[in-house]
A protein has these predicted regions:
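Juxtamembrane extramembrane loops of integral membrane proteins
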Residues: 2-149, 155-164, 168-174, 182, ...
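Residue-level marker of positions within ordered structural domains that often coincide
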Residues: 48, 151, 180, 290, ...
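A broad, low-specificity signal marking well-ordered, structured residues that form hydrophobic/aromatic
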Residues: 41, 144, 154, 290, ...
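Sec-exported extracytoplasmic/periplasmic mature domains
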Residues: 74-77, 176, 180, 264, ...
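N-terminal low-complexity segments that are often proline-rich with Ser/Thr-Pro
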Residues: 401-404
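Acidic, S/T/G-rich, low-cysteine, solvent-exposed domains in lumenal/extracellular/periplasmic regions
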Residues: 204-399
């Protein structure tokens, strides 16, 4: 028994992954990142009994929960996983249950420990847990904190999706934040742009700063900030990624000059826009050699509205993302774009070259110049109105000659 115990410790285990795809091992990139973590590392699971997800992380579930870290523990034997149990009010927790209306957190703890047949003294009180760490900014929901011996720490969260637990991508991204300065994505604001601080259907909080969204930039190794370059803010020299998302009023002269200087020094800029914004967006886009065509694209279909364009990834796009390189051409996958316009390119002062990412079919797609309501009205390509069914580009990437 003693031999079995000691040989089952992470530092004593040697693993040979015989799967063809190395399914049971960390990717080479994750191994490279993990190797840069020096000294012991601790992952502490903070489990709030009054959180609506607490049942997943109670003591009886320890072994199941630790499986996601097994590859990391095998690669780094001095990585230790710990648990801290506490109880405190959670905005999305059991306090929302009508049976707990008017109950104190102590009364809720007593009821929940009775239901789960647990010792109430296992759980630290709100005052006790706050002496260790204040998790109210995390909504007092379940969270893991990875910490190094020299005090560097990062959050590893669960997510509000079907899988819930973080994958290797999110765990490694969190580790990378501890060993290097994460790149900051700066969203331009002040001109009616879509905002990261709002959760409306036209805003960007879900994929930028929402803590419990798997796809959020902050959970994929980035930091996020907002910057108002039109009204006083200066672009910091450390910023190399900016987003200009569908401004509704033109940039001021100061803002435009800043953005041009930023591009001239080699900064990356994502420009996102929608149909109907040509008047505001085209003056700035023209300086980059890009123009949004005036009318929307239409696609003939027996099943869908004419404004639904089913775009395909170009061969060139495969150089930018492995998804477009492998899956899209292999399975003839499409990107659905309900309501879009074609983009045309011309010479520019920055030396940009253009890489088309998405394009339409060569047949059955045209710029509809006669009708504006493309959701319901049947439309046809009318050559006499100057409409032509050819392949159109509606998403492009820019590269300078130095980037190639």
């Amino acid at each position: 028994m003693a031999i079995g115990y000691f040989t089952s410790r992470p530092g004593m285990i040697k693993v040979w992954d015989t799967t063809r795809t190395k399914l049971n091992s960390l990717t080479e990139n994750s191994q490279h990142v993990l190797a840069k973590l020096t000294g012991p590392v601790t992952i502490t699971n903070y489990v709030n009994l009054l959180d609506n997800k607490s049942y997943r992380y109670l003591p009886i579930m320890k072994k199941a929960n630790e499986t996601i870290f097994e590859p990391y523990c095998l690669a780094k034997p001095d990585l230790q996983v710990k648990y801290v149990y506490y109880y405190d009010f959670a905005p999305n927790g059991v306090a929302n249950n009508p049976k707990f209306q008017g109950k104190t957190v102590d009364e809720m703890r007593d009821y929940m420990t009775m239901i789960y047949n647990l010792n109430p003294h296992l759980f630290k009180s709100p005052a006790e847990i706050r002496q260790i760490i204040d998790l109210r900014e995390e909504q007092n929901t379940f969270v893991r904190i990875m910490e190094t011996q020299d005090g560097k720490r990062t959050f590893i969260r669960d997510f509000e999706d079907m899988d819930a637990t973080p994958s290797e991508a999110e765990i490694t991204a969190a580790i990378k934040k501890m060993i290097s300065t994460p790149p900051t994505v700066a969203f331009i604001k002040g001109d009616g742009e879509r905002e990261v601080s709002k959760s409306g259907d036209r805003d960007y909080s879900n994929f930028s700063i929402e803590k419990y969204s798997r796809a959020a930039l902050i959970n994929q190794g980035f930091d996020v900030c907002e910057i108002d370059i039109s009204h006083g803010d200066t672009i910091p020299s450390l910023i190399n990624i900016m987003v200009l998302a569908e401004m509704r009023t033109p940039l001021t002269e100061k803002g435009e000059n800043q953005l041009e200087a930023y591009l001239a020094r080699g900064g990356n800029l994502f420009i996102l826009t929608d149909t109907g914004r040509q008047e505001v967006m085209n003056p700035f886009l023209s300086k980059l050699g890009i123009k949004m065509e005036e009318y929307q694209l239409a696609q003939s279909s027996a099943d869908f509205s004419p404004n639904l364009i089913l775009a395909k990834a170009t061969r060139e796009s495969g150089k930018l993302t492995f998804g477009f390189k492998d899956d899209f051409p292999k399975y003839d996958l499409r990107v659905s774009m309900p309501g879009c316009v074609a983009l045309t390119c011309s010479d520019n002062d920055y030396g940009f070259q253009y890489t088309p990412i998405l394009e339409t079919n060569a047949k059955g797609v045209w710029i509809e110049k006669e009708q504006t309501d493309l959701q319901e009205s049947p439309v046809e390509c009318n050559a006499s109105a100057g409409e032509k069914a050819v392949s159109y580009t509606h998403l492009r990437a820019h590269e300078t000659e130095a980037d190639l």
